[in-house]
Amino acid sequence: MANASLYWFRQDLRLADLPGLIAASKSGQVIPVFIFDEALGGDWKLGGASQWWLHHSLQKLAADLRAIGSRLVLRRGETVHVIAQLLEETGAQNVFASRQYQPWADETEQGVRKVAESAGGAFKRYPGTLLFEPENIRTGGGTPFKVFTPFWRACLKQPAPAQPQPVPALTSPNEWPHSEVLDTWELCPKKPNWAQGWDTLWTPGEAGASTALNTFLESHVNRYGDGRDFPAQPNTSRLSPFLKFGEISPRQIWWTAQNAKQRSPNEGGSIDKFLSEIGWREFCNHLVTQFPAMPDRAWNPKFEYFPWQRHAANLTAWQSGNTGYPIIDAGMRELWQTGFMHNRVRMVVASFLTKHLLMHWREGEQWFWDCLLDADLASNACSWQWVGGSGADASPYFRIFNPIAQGEKFDKSGVYTRHWVPELAEMPDKYLYKPWEAPELTLKAAGVELGKTYPNPIVDHREARETALEAYATLKNVAMA
């Protein structure tokens, strides 16, 4: 198969608008390959929730390839070794792929390049994951951006992203190499099956991504600008897991949104705000390419001296949604039961962990990494550091979300909170977010016994806020070389 090439799928599990796959299709026969490399990423290998999504996404990708007369070859093992094996088995020479931006991607790609060149071919990498390549967006002085707003403004001054491309025709090899059976990878949990019912909430795959985008733009985007912060309302796109696995491209989102804006000019403000959230994803990748250690180390080095606390019981209470603060507990339970959490609530629970409990942002980052379907290395690291105060363009240290006020403001009717914290379902609105202030008769009428049916708060808000401000004040005395 001298004219055969491998297309190496990673976090680009789609067929449309995939420049690398289009290029491979023009080179001759194409062997689509996905490699499950369990060691890749080290501490940041795929979390449990992401593995569930990957299983279903690969199922859909394999079916989509069969529909156009091709196949998906599945292999498990160390990436460079597996690709070397496939090149030898098939006689293919070239390896095509989409660019990835994780800190380990360059080293892996260098290894793939060497084995491809040893086979007499080349490793050919194409954009396809971001709207703008990080090295192309620079300040007037030629340096990388460190603040989001001017970064996104600079992006919007660039030429518009190219139009999305359709699914290419793929020429199959004369003989297909062996493919492993997806089920043997055991990506989905069994005992216990903590993902029970997720298949009724989510439809992984390229078609599911397209449906999610179109549904959002047709039915919900008009309320996005003013309503995106209200977790009980379906005003957000929920596209993040699809984007994480590359089942839809940023260009497809960009142009579908631009077309929607032309059809409905009155919704332009909401659509622009939505696209700025795509911009935040771009910014996070921009930052991680500058500072590859960001998932593990503070962007602001002063925070390496912050007096973080260790308290196993408080961490467990936060993880399990038993802090005694209803909006916090609602969010953490939503995360565990669905693999997702509304963005406003993500900010509130992150602030609570880092500022009320003074626990290291890495504790939250790691928990989200394992539990979120959309756990993206760059976005997860940047967002946690933003809330914790150590990141680029970070939230000010004195911005400490009040979990009572946040619940009262963004879930005033309590629909979201009562759904995820059903033991408080009968509590009147007045006391829903501070049940410890409710009279005993009110608690009894609602069937609530604090400390038994629902926990007492693990910290006092006012005291925790003052302690956090004192802790952050210590950084003023840290002298950096």
Regions found by a protein language model. Name each.
Residues 44, 48-52, 200-207, 318, ...:
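Charge-dense, low-complexity intrinsically disordered segments
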Residues 142-298, 302, 410-411, 415-481:
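Glycine/tryptophan-enriched, flexible segments
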Residues 1-163, 270, 379, 462, ...:
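Trp/Phe/Arg-rich N-terminal binding region typifying the photolyase-homology
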Residues 234-429:
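Active-site-proximal binding-pocket segments
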